[in-house]
Every structure is written in structure tokens, then in C-alpha cells.
């Protein structure tokens, strides 16, 4: 079962290529700071602009660098089922601990199509699978009924990442799918309310910047200390907000550049932050006394 504090890791670039030195340093940073798992090649990892070869190489590199010290979850979804199967099979082959498979985007499948898609991936590849529900980007939402059917029939569908503000949906998933299924927040600002309803952790953007604090929030919530969890939530709330002042992952990668972790480099169609928003981000980071280097 996946739970705890999981980082949605950025993918650093340098001169147009994946910066593996910086990526290795980021992985070490999370090992040192007690993060429970890293997710590579997700939304925050700019997976849509990676080539197939880069995608596979990043996953393989992360698994080798982690060397069993921290779990590695690979983003392996796509809007073509055969591609999702291929990427998921590769993730298993190189030793990833699990796969995050996004709801197919753009082609807007029906619930039957979503069921067949995820069932095919789960049956073809025996690896723990997290369903990634993010309707703001996919334009379609997998229903709780469909998820319940999938989890009932496929033992390796073990969790969902929920990037939705719909708390009724979270309640329904927790109630119907039970303790053996992990609900993971996909939105830092909503992690605390989701965990109050029974979610078991977060796949976090803010974790790239302040992993120890996010880990403490999750620890407190899992132990039922919601007073402490609430204190940390409000302490981090300004960070949660500013990291989404522009499209993710633009602000968080810019924050990592300010902290000297990577270059400030994106691939089109993503571009650098506006100067105004970059200044807002810098002021928030200063508030937390973070060691700014750029």
C-alpha cells in the first residue's frame, strides 16, 4: 500500500537535455529528508514534453539512484492504452515500486472505456497501480463505481491520486473501497481535509521545496493528531498557494532554481514565470527563511 509523503518530482533540464546530475541530487535530497517515495515522470515532472526514450531513461535512472532507499513510483499513463501498457511494463522491468496511470486525456473515453483501459494495464503488467484522477487536465473523471469495479477485480489497483476538490467523492471512495485501498491527495491545499476523511497521504508539489514540513503534516494526520496537522497546514498554506500561481510545474521548478537545485529551464509550450509572479514566489520563499541562491 502506498501512503505517506510522496514527492511529485520535477525533471531538471540543462541545455535542452535532462540534467541527470541535478536529478540525482534531487533524489538524494529526498532520501536525506525522509520523503516516503518519489514520483517521476508525472505532471510535475513535465512528462508530456519528454520523449519516450527520455521517459524510460528517467525512470530507470531514478530506480538505480534510489537503490532501495526510497520507493520509486513511475508515471506511465497515456491516452493510448497500448502506450500505457508499454511504459508500465518498462517501469516494472527496471524495478519501479509502482505505477501512476493517469485517466486518458483529450479523447474523453466513456466509463466503459476507462474500465477497459485500466483493466488492460493491470492485467498486462503485475505492478501496484495508482489511478490518477485529474479532471481539470483530462476533461473526464473516472467514477467511483468504475474505480470500485476495477479495484474489486484487479488486486494490483491499490490506490488513487485525487486532484479534485470534491470531498463527497473522497468520502465515497474511502467508504466503498475500504482500508486496503489508499486515497492520496493530489493537491497540497486539500491534503489535510482529504486526510480527515480517510486519505492516507499526498503526492505533493510542495514536497520539492519543504519536504520535512510536508512529511510532518502527513505524520501528524496519520497518527490522528489533527491539531498539529492543522498548524502545519496553515504554516505552509502560503507556499501551497504560490506554487500554483501559474501552471504547475512552472512555479515549483522556479522555486527549485532559486534554491540552487536546478536550472530555470522548461520545454515549450511551458515558459518561464512572469517577472511579477516570480517576485511573489521569491517573497514567499523568503518568509520561510529558505536558502535562496538565485
From Swiss-Prot:
Q: Which UniProt keywords apply?
A: Amino-acid biosynthesis, Cytoplasm, Diaminopimelate biosynthesis, Lyase, Lysine biosynthesis, Schiff base
Cleaved signal peptide residues: none
Among SMART domains, the record links this protein to: DHDPS
Q: How does it assemble?
A: Homotetramer; dimer of dimers.
User: Could you name the active-site residues?
Assistant: 132, 161
* Family annotation (CDD domains): DHDPS
The catalysed reaction is: L-aspartate 4-semialdehyde + pyruvate = (2S,4S)-4-hydroxy-2,3,4,5-tetrahydrodipicolinate + H2O + H(+)
Give the Enzyme Commission number. 4.3.3.7
Q: In which pathway does it act?
A: Amino-acid biosynthesis; L-lysine biosynthesis via DAP pathway; (S)-tetrahydrodipicolinate from L-aspartate: step 3/4
GO molecular-function term, one example from the UniProt record:
4-hydroxy-tetrahydrodipicolinate synthase activity
Regarding protein family, the annotation reads:
Belongs to the DapA family.
Record-given protein name: 4-hydroxy-tetrahydrodipicolinate synthase
* Top-level division of the source organism's lineage: Bacteria
Sites binding pyruvate sit at: 44, 203
Give its localization. Answer: Cytoplasm
Q: What does this protein do?
A: Catalyzes the condensation of (S)-aspartate-beta-semialdehyde [(S)-ASA] and pyruvate to 4-hydroxy-tetrahydrodipicolinate (HTPA).
GO biological-process terms attached to the record: diaminopimelate biosynthetic process; lysine biosynthetic process via diaminopimelate
Residues flagged as site, Part of a proton relay during catalysis? 43, 106
NCBIfam families xref list: dapA (TIGR00674)
